[in-house]
């Protein structure tokens, strides 16, 4: 662990609310409109917010910063989180479709271990995440009944809540990882 002076100074772009990532006028998660009506639109709204948050935590960083590991022995990095969430989106689609889909990155933990400081790896990770999110979203759009049970016994509702929980948990990790990289803070 480095000395205190080795740590980046904490900072935020926000001027209105210093505990935020950016000011409300610049925050893509902010909406002046009413909150969604209904359970499914509410779940989708929360999921969207966490997806945007993950992207925001990674913005402005180069491949080395994105691939920087957290605290040993962890292999966690911001780039690893992007790859991991692409992998779990693929897994969820397998649940929905009732079939086993081959892993994107191979063996267990390859999503984190393969997160290296290479622009091609970064570009591929973002492309994988966008593709897998869209594919899982499309598979779920065909099943609007939240009470429907999948082949493995999981309800669509449970899957949606699990997706939100997975993104929320990893956005918390991303908060800490980003602060360690360059000191930027804010929710």
Which residues does each predicted region cover?
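Short, contiguous alpha-helical
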Residues: 2-26, 30-32, 40-111, 150-187
